[in-house]
Amino acid sequence: MEAVHDFYPILFLVILFIVLYIAIKTGVFAHFKETFRLQNLLWLLGFVIVGYILGNIAHYLYLRFVPALDTIVENEATNNFVDSFLPTWFVYILMVVIAPIYEELMFREYFYRFFSHKWLAYILSILLFTLIHTRLTWSFFEYLPMSVIVTSTFHRYKRVSDSIIVHGGYNLMVLIFHIII
C-alpha cells in the first residue's frame, strides 16, 4: 500500500504539469498580471467571502433537510476514498493549489473555448462542476453556490487566473475552519 500511497501524488503532479503546459502554450495565462491588480484582488476577496458565506448557508440547509444517515454516508465515502491513498499534507496541497488550477482550466477555460454560446458554457460549467463533486446526491445543493461564484468570477473577465484564486481561496478558508473547528 505504501507504494500506491507514494505514487498518486506523483501522478497528480504529472497530470497537473501537462495541463499547465497546454494552458501556457495556448495563451491561457496571457492576462495573468491583471489578476494581481489591487482593485481586482479586492473583488476576488469579495467573491471568496461571499462564496464562503453562501457555502455555509447551503451546508446548514443541507444538514437541516437531508436525513442525517445520507449525509454521513456521502461524506464518509469521499473522505475514506481520499484518505485511503493520499498523505494528509498532499490532500491539503491538492485542495488549495492543484485542484483549483486543474478544475478551473477544465471547467471554465476549456469549457468556454469549446462552447461558442457563453451563457450555455456558463450554465453547463456550473452544473457539471457541481455534479462531478457530488455524484448526483443531495449535496449537489451544498456545492452549487460555490460553483456559481467561481464560474461567475471567470465569466466576468474570462480570466482563469481569477477563478483559480477564488477557488483556491475558498478551499483554503474551508480547510482553515475545518482544522480550527
UniProtKB/Swiss-Prot annotation:
InterPro entries: CAAX_protease, Rce1/LyrA-like_dom. The keyword Electron transport does not apply. Keywords: Cell membrane, Membrane, Transmembrane, Transmembrane helix. GO terms for cellular component: plasma membrane. The chain crosses the membrane at residues 10-30, 41-61, 81-101, 114-134, 161-181. It is a multi-pass membrane protein. This is UPF0177 protein YbdI. It comes from Lactococcus lactis subsp. lactis (strain IL1403). The lineage of its organism: Bacteria, Bacillati, Bacillota, Bacilli, Lactobacillales. The gene is ybdI.
